[in-house]
Amino acid sequence: MSDVPGIVVTGGSGRMGRMLIETVRGSDAARLVGVTERPGHDWIGADIGVALGGAAIGVTVTDDPLEAFATAQAVIDFTSPAATVAHAELTAQARAVHVIGTTGFSPADLAHLEAAARHAVIVRAGNMSLGVNLLVKLTEKVAAALDADYDIEVIEAHHRHKVDAPSGTALMLGEAAAAGRGVALADVSDRGRDGITGERKRGDIGFSAIRGGDIVGEHDVLFAAEGERITLRHVASDRSVFARGALKAALWGQDKGPGAYDMMDVLGL
């Protein structure tokens, strides 16, 4: 097993962190070599197997990401924008593949990630699942085929704990729709309607976000015209689809040169 890539999972106590740990541990193509958590977390210094309620596996949770990254060939990161930006500088130093599923980045954050990608392989996507990335491609094709008589709305739903909106996946879908129409999303995006808004502006791409319960992730792209509607839909029922995609990205990046990649590159779409 020592000849397979070593993976570090950041934010191991979170919902995605736990799923990533389970996915890596269950894979014959990778091995778990590190888990990080924020300073002061109860798990610091504990064996991750014990922290998760099982037997020790010889991997200690640390609050020193550079130490953890130094032993890894890839880092899988579903944390916060601030943490991910800090991690990007360290993965570049460690020459480890950095797989980023974090969302909610500011333009300044993205600039930092682009700078880090000059020295490291960074695979970043708002969604790591095959189904969603196929949906992105379909959205672009449908948007290109239909004119502005078809109003485009992106509707997404997630669990009550999600802190950013629209979701990274919704923005991916919006970007795809805008690309299909040959426009910039920033010029046509409508992210909030409240009160007397007036009529819908022709050509706009609207976003709606739902938060509640334990919804893993649901995304609809609606093309609505007079007399007919087309809906493209993806429903994730289990976070394992994201974890499997992230691990696939980590393995795919092993023989790639420094640069910024996404799941379309990983999946060859």
Swiss-Prot record:
Reactions performed catalytically: (S)-2,3,4,5-tetrahydrodipicolinate + NAD(+) + H2O = (2S,4S)-4-hydroxy-2,3,4,5-tetrahydrodipicolinate + NADH + H(+); (S)-2,3,4,5-tetrahydrodipicolinate + NADP(+) + H2O = (2S,4S)-4-hydroxy-2,3,4,5-tetrahydrodipicolinate + NADPH + H(+)
Record GO cellular component, one term: cytosol
GO biological process: diaminopimelate biosynthetic process; lysine biosynthetic process via diaminopimelate
Family: Belongs to the DapB family.
Residues engaged in binding NAD(+): 11-16, 37, 101-103, 125-128
Listed CDD domains: DHDPR_N
GO molecular function (one): 4-hydroxy-tetrahydrodipicolinate reductase
Disulfide bond positions: none
Gene3D superfamilies xref list: Dihydrodipicolinate Reductase, domain 2, NAD(P)-binding Rossmann-like Domain
Binding site for NADP(+): 38
Keyword check for NADP: yes
Function of the molecule: Catalyzes the conversion of 4-hydroxy-tetrahydrodipicolinate (HTPA) to tetrahydrodipicolinate.
Subcellular locations according to the entry: Cytoplasm
Binding-site list for (S)-2,3,4,5-tetrahydrodipicolinate: 159, 168-169
Pathway entry: Amino-acid biosynthesis; L-lysine biosynthesis via DAP pathway; (S)-tetrahydrodipicolinate from L-aspartate: step 4/4
Keywords (A to Z) from UniProt: Amino-acid biosynthesis, Cytoplasm, Diaminopimelate biosynthesis, Lysine biosynthesis, NAD, NADP, Oxidoreductase
Organism: Dinoroseobacter shibae (strain DSM 16493 / NCIMB 14021 / DFL 12)
UniProt-recorded name of the protein: 4-hydroxy-tetrahydrodipicolinate reductase
